[in-house]
C-alpha cells in the first residue's frame, strides 16, 4: 500500500462547538415551567366547560410557540437546534400529559352530564375523551421510540454496486457520523459490528466527537482510541478517514495509535483502487480533478454536496445528513442541511449522470449539543457496500 499523495491543503473551518459551553439549563427549566402552567390552564378551562376545550388547546399551542421563540432566542449558538429541543419537550413530554389529562377531564364531565355547573348542552361527545387519550398515548409512544429506542437501534444496510473495474468482490464498510460526546457501550457495539463484517476497506466520513469542552474532547479522544484498538478491526486493505463539521484543526490526532489513517488527498490501495479523501470545504464545493486511471475510483467526503459537481469517479460516499434523523412517510427527511435532493440525503443509492454511484450514510450517531437527541423512522446504520464485477 502506498502512502497518500499530498494535495493543496484547504483551511478547514474551526469547529464552533469545541470549547464553547453555554448554560442552557435555566432556559430549559424556565420553558418547561411555562408549559407546565399552560398544561394546568388548558385542563382548568376544559374543566369549566367542554366547549372551552378547543380554545384551551389553541391557547396552549400559542403559548408553546411564543415560549419556544422567547426561550430559544436566548441561546445564540445553534439557536434553531435549541428551539427544536424545546419544541420536542412540549410535544413529547407535555403533549401526552396534557392530552391524557384532557381525556380524564372530558370523561368525568361525560359521566356528570356536562360541566360542574350543569350547563345544558355542555356534555362532551363520547368520542372526545377517547380521541384525546389516543392522541396522548400516540405521542408518548412516538417519544419513547424517538428518544429511547431508535437512537441505538443500529442497522446494517447492504448495497451492491457492479463495476467493470474490479475482478473480485470488494467489501467496504462506511462509518459516518459517530458524533458522540461519550464513548460507551453503543459506540463499542458499533465497532464490534464493523469488525464482524471483516471489511476489505473501512472508510470513515467525518464527525466523530461532539463535545462541549476541550477537556471532554481530550478525554473522549483517548476513549475512542482505546475502543478502536480493542475492537479487533483489521481491514485487509486499510482504513481511511476524512474530517467533518465537528472536527477542528489537528483532528488527525484523533486516530493516533490506531489503524485508521487520516486522508486528505489521494491514496492508491493495492494498485487497483484509488481513494480520494476530501477536506470539509471540498466536500461542499466539489472534488479536485485527478488524472484518468483504470483503477476503481472512490471519492470520500463528509458532506454529499460534492456530488453536485462533476467528478471522475465510480463510487461517491458521504455522511453528514444523518438521513434527516427524522423522516415522515411519503415526505422523507424533514431537514438535511445539504443542497442535494432529499432522496439522496436519505441514503437512497443514486446513479448520477456521470455514471458514478452516490451513497449517503444515515450515520450511527446524532446531533448533540443543544439539539434534541432523537431519531424517528430513521435508524442509525453501518453502510456495507459490496463492489462486485459487472456482468460481461
List PLM regions with ranges.
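Non-catalytic terminal accessory segments
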Residues: 1-151
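Membrane-embedded segments
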Residues: 152-155, 165-257, 261
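Beta-strand-turn-beta hairpins that frame and shape the catalytic cleft
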Residues: 154, 159-173, 260, 267-277, ...
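Active-site metal-binding loops of divalent metal-dependent hydrolases
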Residues: 175-180, 206-208, 244-246, 266-267, ...
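Binuclear metal-dependent hydrolase catalytic cores centered on His/Asp/Glu-rich metal-binding motifs
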Residues: 250, 254-259, 264-308, 371-379
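Conserved beta-sheet core of the metallophosphoesterase superfamily
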Residues: 304-383
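Short beta-strand-to-coil "C-cap" segments at the C-terminal boundary of structured domains/repeats
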Residues: 385-391
Amino acid at each position: 500500500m502506498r502512502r497518500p499523495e499530498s494535495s493543496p491543503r484547504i483551511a478547514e473551518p474551526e469547529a464552533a462547538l469545541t470549547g464553547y459551553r453555554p448554560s442552557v439549563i435555566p432556559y430549559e427549566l424556565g420553558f418547561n415551567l411555562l408549559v407546565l402552567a399552560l398544561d394546568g390552564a388548558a385542563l382548568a378551562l376544559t374543566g369549566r366547560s367542554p366547549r372551552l376545550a378547543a380554545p384551551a388547546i389553541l391557547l396552549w399551542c400559542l403559548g408553546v410557540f411564543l415560549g419556544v421563540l422567547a426561550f430559544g432566542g436566548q441561546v445564540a449558538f445553534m439557536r434553531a437546534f435549541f428551539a427544536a429541543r424545546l419544541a420536542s419537550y412540549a410535544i413529547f413530554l407535555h403533549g401526552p400529559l396534557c392530552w391524557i389529562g384532557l381525556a380524564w377531564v372530558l370523561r368525568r364531565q361525560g359521566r356528570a352530564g356536562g360541566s360542574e355547573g350543569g350547563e345544558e348542552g355542555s356534555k362532551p361527545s363520547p368520542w372526545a375523551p377517547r380521541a384525546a387519550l389516543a392522541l396522548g398515548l400516540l405521542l408518548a409512544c412516538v417519544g419513547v421510540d424517538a428518544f429511547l429506542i431508535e437512537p441505538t437501534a443500529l442497522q446494517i444496510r447492504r448495497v451492491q454496486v457492479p463495476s467493470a473495474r474490479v475482478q473480485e468482490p470488494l467489501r467496504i464498510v462506511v462509518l459516518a457520523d459517530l458524533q458522540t460526546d461519550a464513548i460507551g457501550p453503543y459506540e463499542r457495539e458499533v465497532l464490534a459490528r464493523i469488525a464482524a463484517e471483516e471489511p476489505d476497506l473501512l472508510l470513515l466520513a467525518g464527525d466523530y466527537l461532539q463535545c462541549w469542552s476541550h477537556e471532554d474532547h481530550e478525554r473522549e479522544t483517548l476513549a475512542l482510541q482505546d475502543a478502536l484498538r480493542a475492537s479487533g478491526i483489521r481491514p485487509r486493505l486499510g482504513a481511511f478517514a476524512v474530517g467533518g463539521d465537528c472536527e477542528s484543526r489537528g483532528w488527525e490526532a484523533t486516530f493516533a495509535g490506531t489503524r485508521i489513517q487520516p486522508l486528505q488527498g489521494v491514496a492508491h490501495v493495492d494498485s487497483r483502487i484509488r481513494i480520494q479523501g476530501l477536506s470539509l470545504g471540498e466536500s461542499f464545493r466539489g472534488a479536485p480533478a485527478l488524472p484518468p486511471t483504470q483503477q476503481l475510483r472512490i471519492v470520500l467526503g463528509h458532506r454529499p454536496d460534492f456530488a453536485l459537481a462533476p467528478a471522475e469517479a465510480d463510487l461517491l460516499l458521504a455522511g453528514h445528513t444523518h438521513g434527516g434523523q427524522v423522516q415522515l412517510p411519503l415526505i422523507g427527511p424533514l431537514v438535511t442541511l445539504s443542497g442535494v435532493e432529499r432522496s439522496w440525503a436519505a441514503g437512497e443509492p443514486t446513479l448520477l449522470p456521470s455514471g458514478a454511484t452516490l451513497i449517503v450514510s444515515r450515520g450511527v450517531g446524532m446531533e448533540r449539543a443543544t439539539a434534541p437527541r432523537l431519531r424517528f423512522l430513521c435508524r442509525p446504520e453501518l453502510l456495507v457496500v459490496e463492489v462486485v464485477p459487472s456482468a460481461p
